[in-house]
Amino acid sequence: MERWWFNSMLFKKEFERRCGLNKSMGSLGPIENTNEDPNRKVKNIHSWRNRDNSSCSNVDYLFGVKDIRNFISDDTFLVSDRNGDSYSIYFDIENHIFEIDNDHSFLSELESSFYSYRNSNYRNNGFRGEDPYYNSYMYDTQYSWNNHINSCIDSYLQSQICIDTSIISGSENYGDSYIYRAVCGGESRNSSENEGSSRRTRTKGSDLTIRESSNDLEVTQKYRHLWVQCENCYGLNYKKFLKSKMNICEQCGYHLKMSSSDRIELLIDPGTWDPMDEDMVSLDPIEFHSEEEPYKDRIDSYQRKTGLTEAVQTGIGQLNGIPVAIGVMDFQFMGGSMGSVVGEKITRLIEYAANQILPLIIVCASGGARMQEGSLSLMQMAKISSALYDYQLNKKLFYVSILTSPTTGGVTASFGMLGDIIIAEPNAYIAFAGKRVIEQTLNKTVPEGSQAAEYLFQKGLFDLIVPRNLLKSVLSELFKLHAFFPLNQKSSKIK
């Protein structure tokens, strides 16, 4: 077995706060834990690039966990084997690179730069002639390589320093990463085998066996609340930055779910929001009780969890100075389901907008009618549609429907599709019956993407697909086109 040692670290730069990590595993083969000491965690590397006679390596590193900030940065390491052959390991967070190369010109410069450092180290530690794996190109370090590089990131999380990171395996699947599983608390989406505390993950051209302690897993579980998982690419987005990015995934640009409060903050000018009917709550009209939890208890639970009284917020505000009536559904409250209170609040909003001659916006995010209220929830479809009929046809006012993911069931079948202008968000899931319901009922497979906004837009179901960063300006232009102007412009026109 050949032993490899990190000779020196070329650069030390201050840690980039927002970083991404891409393990380029193409040059690495299987990684297995074959160390004689079971209490010591090692990383063995097979199949180095362009080396047929290499079997594996036992890698030690130059610093402890406390120096993780220096490790996760733009650093280059010199690696030498027992024969004196040298390799450079380049680790660049900014450009998502982790490479191993044999560049002699670079290595000569590197060895020259650290010649004095090695001499100083030898004087302090003495010559280790008795070690058959020690030569003039190497020096021992006081720390061993504790784990795979993901464990380093794991330790970094334990230091409670906030980072915005993406962890991409060689197969570009976040589920293959140990830190992904630790943060998300779920299993890899690819096939994996778990035996005791050992995990084996299959990546492109490599096998990873990671020995992990239960303490590490328990520690990382504590940080799950710091991250939001993308529904599309399964990447991790740092929650602190996500709101400023309008809940759009940094890795793939997918539009993640937003709370009703965040949407109001996105669309309505600061200081102009005036909510309506905040004290209206459900009273369990049909006394629905399930074996798991009574309906009233579920309502109370969601009220505590979301801080809302119901699955919709309604009110009056200004959008770029234009007075508007707006209702925003919240999927976090019982899946945005439409019960009698939701229907009543939306109906009152429409009637108020009709009386005050205001444009109307309803942002839809719902699983449909609320089954716990039976036929009363179904009647909300007819009630809201009737109010919209008076608003649109009799009052000749302007209603914009915004469909977000997901919009299904009774909401799709009623006011969701009644807008004068219907706008959908990118990648929004929009349907009457969901995919699972259709497949279980008809025993047929629903084609992938057939209920996505882009596919339905091609079929003429919507007028526009508008990203979140453009939505407010698009709505403002639509209102001006329909003779709804900001208050200051309107008053100047009257004068």
Curated annotation (Swiss-Prot):
EC supergroup of this enzyme: transferase
First-listed, main subcellular location of the protein, grouped into a coarse class: plastid
Transmembrane annotation, as ranges: none
Listed GO CC annotations: acetyl-CoA carboxylase complex; chloroplast stroma
InterPro entries in UniProt: AcCoA_carboxyl_beta, Acetyl_CoA_COase_Trfase_b_su, ClpP/crotonase-like_dom_sf, COA_CT_N
Binding, Zn(2+): 230, 233, 249, 252
Zinc finger (C4-type): 230-252
Reactions catalysed according to its record: N(6)-carboxybiotinyl-L-lysyl-[protein] + acetyl-CoA = N(6)-biotinyl-L-lysyl-[protein] + malonyl-CoA
Subcellular compartments: Plastid, Chloroplast stroma
Top-level taxon of the source organism: Eukaryota
Cofactor: Zn(2+)
EC number(s) stated in the UniProt entry for this protein: 2.1.3.15
Cofactor note: Binds 1 zinc ion per subunit.
BP-aspect Gene Ontology terms: fatty acid biosynthetic process; malonyl-CoA biosynthetic process
Tissue expression per record: RNA expressed in leaf, root and stem; the least expression occurs in stems.
Biological or metabolic pathway of the protein: Lipid metabolism; malonyl-CoA biosynthesis; malonyl-CoA from acetyl-CoA: step 1/1
Applied use: Overexpression of the accD operon increases the specific activity of acetyl-coenzyme A carboxylase, increases leaf longevity and seed production. The accD operon consists of accD, psaI, ycf4, cemA, and petA in this order.
Annotated stretches, region: Disordered: 187-208
GO molecular function annotations of the record: acetyl-CoA carboxylase activity; ATP binding; carboxyl- or carbamoyltransferase activity; zinc ion binding
Pfam families: Carboxyl_trans (PF01039)
Key words, A-Z: ATP-binding, Chloroplast, Fatty acid biosynthesis, Fatty acid metabolism, Lipid biosynthesis, Lipid metabolism, Metal-binding, Nucleotide-binding, Plastid, Transferase, Zinc, Zinc-finger
Annotated CoA carboxyltransferase N-terminal domain residues: 226-495
Family, as annotated: Belongs to the AccD/PCCB family.
Quaternary data: Acetyl-CoA carboxylase is a heterohexamer composed of biotin carboxyl carrier protein, biotin carboxylase and 2 subunits each of ACCase subunit alpha and ACCase plastid-coded subunit beta (accD).
Function according to Swiss-Prot or TrEMBL: Component of the acetyl coenzyme A carboxylase (ACC) complex. Biotin carboxylase (BC) catalyzes the carboxylation of biotin on its carrier protein (BCCP) and then the CO(2) group is transferred by the transcarboxylase to acetyl-CoA to form malonyl-CoA.
Name recorded for this polypeptide: Acetyl-coenzyme A carboxylase carboxyl transferase subunit beta, chloroplastic
Organism of origin: Nicotiana tabacum
